[in-house]
Amino acid sequence: MKANELREKSVEELNTELLGLLREQFNLRMQAASGQLQQTHLVKQVRHNIARVKTLLTEKAGA
């Protein structure tokens, strides 16, 4: 997911995206804890995507 794609979205869409990413992060953490996660790099990718969305939400709130 690119920041440019996210910048085009509205605040409601970003909040929906954030909720989906948080759910995905939870599921990945549960898989990692139970030893079922094969692609551990996905945890980092999701964490960075969450940070991107939160940054854009903060920018839009200030503007």
Curated annotation (Swiss-Prot):
GO terms for biological process: translation. One of its GO terms (molecular function) is structural constituent of ribosome. It comes from Pectobacterium carotovorum subsp. carotovorum (strain PC1). PROSITE patterns: RIBOSOMAL_L29 (PS00579). One of its GO terms (cellular component) is cytosolic large ribosomal subunit. Gene3D superfamilies: 1.10.287.310. The gene is rpmC. Belongs to the universal ribosomal protein uL29 family. InterPro entries: Ribosomal_protein_uL29 (IPR050063), Ribosomal_uL29 (IPR001854), Ribosomal_uL29_CS (IPR018254), Ribosomal_uL29_sf (IPR036049). This is Large ribosomal subunit protein uL29. Keywords: Ribonucleoprotein, Ribosomal protein.
